[in-house]
């Protein structure tokens, strides 16, 4: 059962940096629905993309799986034999709950839920990889190497789904979408104090990129095609495709 997010409703003397700890994991479903515009649509559409791209006898990776929402969406839409989903997160609290969520929904496709660092996981025989609001928490200097590894581990014709919060090269547009996002959170019941305190904790650990920067990295990794398929305010998702005739 999900609890309502009230983590920042009272003043916190020393905020520190954001961590995905037990307190966050407990309220995460409510938090992300009220904080990330379009999140439910992205999760649903990841399942539709899985139906199109997952191939028999291959693996799907959910890198930074949190509580397993994307993993479950993928699994509901796999209709092939001998597939496996590998879900990884470095937060013990998230992984504990993820295992419970996965076990609560029975399906033929097995899921390996792993507590670990996505930078250390080998990507092999993959028809689809999901990075759902995960890359933004890596150091910018480490992002290209992860995308390179994903490209190498994808089979020809495979897909990467990359969802992120974006920054914008046009400052005026960035300001507008930033303010619209805050309006969204206010409309979902967050107070000015809650919005401010959460932003202060996130600003040193969640470093956003522009869509142009993401596309450049994907191109450098080897992806022949990439495009933004969903956006709501300053949140969105790209799909990157490995050519069917890639070596």
From Swiss-Prot:
Task: Give any Gene Ontology cellular component.
Answer: cytosol
Asked if S-adenosyl-L-methionine is a keyword of the record, the answer is: yes
Q: Which GO terms describe its molecular function?
A: carboxyl- or carbamoyltransferase activity; protein homodimerization activity; S-adenosyl-L-methionine binding
Q: Which reaction does it catalyse?
A: prephenate + S-adenosyl-L-methionine = carboxy-S-adenosyl-L-methionine + 3-phenylpyruvate + H2O
Lineage top rank: taxon: Bacteria
The EC designation for this entry is 2.1.3.-
Query: Keyword annotations for this protein?
Result: S-adenosyl-L-methionine, Transferase
Residues binding S-adenosyl-L-methionine are: 39, 64-66, 89-90, 117-118, 132, 199
GO BP field: tRNA wobble uridine modification
Kindly indicate whether the keyword Transferase belongs to this entry. yes
What does the UniProt record say this protein does? Catalyzes the conversion of S-adenosyl-L-methionine (SAM) to carboxy-S-adenosyl-L-methionine (Cx-SAM).
Checking NCBIfam families in the record gives: carboxy-S-adenosyl-L-methionine synthase CmoA (TIGR00740), PRK15451.1 (NF011995)
What is the protein's quaternary organization? Homodimer.
Q: Quote the record's miscellaneous comment.
A: Mechanistic analyses show the involvement of a unique ylide intermediate as the carboxyl acceptor in the conversion of SAM to Cx-SAM.
Q: Which family does it belong to?
A: Belongs to the class I-like SAM-binding methyltransferase superfamily. Cx-SAM synthase family.
Q: Could you identify this protein by its name? A: Carboxy-S-adenosyl-L-methionine synthase
- Organism equals Escherichia coli (strain K12)
């Amino acid at each position: 059962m999900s609890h309502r997010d009230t983590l920042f409703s009272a003043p916190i003397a020393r905020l520190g940096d954001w961590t995905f700890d037990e307190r966050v994991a407990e309220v995460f479903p409510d938090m992300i629905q009220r904080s990330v515009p379009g999140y439910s649509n992205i999760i649903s559409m990841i399942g539709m993309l899985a139906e199109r791209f997952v191939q028999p006898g291959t693996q799907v990776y959910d890198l930074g799986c949190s509580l397993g929402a994307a993993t479950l969406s993928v699994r509901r839409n796999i209709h092939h034999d001998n597939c496996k989903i590998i879900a990884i997160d470095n937060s013990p609290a998230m992984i504990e709950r993820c295992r419970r969520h996965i076990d609560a929904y029975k399906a033929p496709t097995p899921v390996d839920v792993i507590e670990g660092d996505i930078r250390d996981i080998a990507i092999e025989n993959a028809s689809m990889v999901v990075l759902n609001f995960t890359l933004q928490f890596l150091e910018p200097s480490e992002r290209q190497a992860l995308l390179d590894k994903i490209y190498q581990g994808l089979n020809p014709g495979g897909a990467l789904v990359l969802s992120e919060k974006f920054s914008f090269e046009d400052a005026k547009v960035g300001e507008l979408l930033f303010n619209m996002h805050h309006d969204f959170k206010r409309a979902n019941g967050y107070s000015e104090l809650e919005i401010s305190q959460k932003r202060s904790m996130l600003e040193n650990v969640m470093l956003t990129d522009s869509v142009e920067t993401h596309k450049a990295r994907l191109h450098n990794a080897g992806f022949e095609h990439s495009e933004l398929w969903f956006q709501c305010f300053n949140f969105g998702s790209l799909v990157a495709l490995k050519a069917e005739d890639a070596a």
